[in-house]
């Protein structure tokens, strides 16, 4: 009733323990006098007191409510400021963004997802002012994907929204049997570009005791030309699925069980993809976000095989890097280069969540991840989720994170200055590749291990810090000959398909350069000894010891003691051997480095017209180890915290060993892009109309004069950087050098 008030309600225990903003919903309950209608508007006074009796009032505001409820955003500590309504705080955020000029423009070709705007289905009656403010905030940040009924006419005219094929829909809740009818009934079908099949999905499951699964397994084996005896069974009624508990007793059955589970799920997704393509036509891509947690391991079956078999057509992942003790946001490049390999044949566009979460991430690491994603092939921007806390309690950017909100706006508008080249362009192919082995992945998983993925990442970082461009190739690429033009192959694994090992042997004989770490492919896909590569390495015998299963660059690894030390010509000191040691008895190989006990640590062998190097430990891990301080892992939101620490003090002797094949192949002087600071992640993205060189600075500091040399630029009409205003440009025939200041990220845009 008018004039009445509620009792005091204690809220202090619910305030955020970190002192951050959060929302509180106030619902006004009132009794309408008999015979009267409820009013459209209700005037209420909301008071906050420092005591339970209301004697020490610290805030009092009067509001006219449209409906019965409203939301306050309240600080974790009222000494830091007063509470605000959503309208007030949106007005404040808009003012902060408008006071921050941006030189870029909203993208029109590349979709931008994951930014707030439009309708909101929260626990309140959303009034027009709130929705208008929310929508303009999203527009100012660069959101360019809107349904036709989401935009206010004044905002649509002011921001000139593209009306192209940019919409995304999610059909995870639509069964395959009903998917076609569902798609036919959609409005705006012609505007859809992305169809999501789910979030953080997995493939490869099967039920050991399921009669239908085992029956499908039999049909799968028959289609592959296999009989029960090939897998160690007597008759078909004895053939069955096998999991990790029997993997090492029944290795052939286990290997084919894993392939069956993966391919079974791929075909389910492929069926949905075919329906989408039938109804929505060309230019529409299917995908589902893949989580790389917790080892940032792009497992071959899901991350590569699925797309090579067209289960889906848009490789898609997320960073969440600040949650995992990875080396740095440069792991983004590793993930995307694997996804780029997955979609290589059809040039599938990559979709990547670059996450601005605050608290959690920082503007620096957001910028690094964003620019590394662009450099390695990302074509769909998704911030999941650049929204305030009232939208999610897990994925959000807090109101007070002004620098993060600015970074989101800047990054989005940076892309608008180069999107025509990025969308139609491709990362320039490399003559150097890392070989992915599905066989190694399957047997690593059987042991509960991810250690070869750990070393593979470390070899990747080493080569990228040597400014070597990298592609990833597969066992299938070796078998079908599509990897034949690769000059240098790096292999980090234990197992290889026998057919792939034979092709790798022939590739070396024909002039290829092979570099392998401890393991080297002496086991086949059935976990059986294999000597196909022994003459390639020039090895008479070998045995392998691996001491760890799971490590992270910033957790556990920095306290690890070396198993031994070894010498190498030109190294300033002896190098440590971490995690793995392979005892090698050379036959024709030359011993280049020895362990303290005199045994071979690095061998090199001429085989036919090619050359093979085998390092009997993990040299990539030796490269990163001195750069990681012995600090406890944290999840802080400060660039000073260990979660956001950028390592720089790497072992240059280890890099020398790993990068030596690049020099021997004559590639060191013809790298497509080189920068004066090797810790800048840079690639060449090329289209018929120009080149984009995306730069991500992992040197842990501002670079006042970075010189970037780009090969084979061709005819040049204009050169700009999307951020740096001061450029020095020099031509050297077909090549170009650009000198510019670099903080964390930038793009050089060369138009032809």
Model regions: which residues?
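A conserved amphipathic helix/loop scaffold
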Residues: 492-752
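Aromatic/acidic polysaccharide-binding cleft in carbohydrate-active enzymes
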Residues: 315-322, 351-406, 429-449, 520-521, ...
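The substrate-binding groove and active-site-proximal loops of carbohydrate-active enzymes
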Residues: 110, 114-119, 163-175, 247-266, ...
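Polysaccharide-binding and catalytic clefts of secreted carbohydrate-active enzymes
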Residues: 84-92, 96, 100, 178-342
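Catalytic-core region of carbohydrate-active enzymes that cleave or remodel glycosidic bonds
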Residues: 272-285, 302-388, 495, 594-598, ...
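Mature N-terminal, pre-catalytic/accessory segment of carbohydrate-active enzymes
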Residues: 1-162, 166, 175-197, 230-235, ...
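Aromatic-Pro/Gly-enriched surface loop or interdomain linker
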Residues: 93, 98-106, 401-485, 518, ...
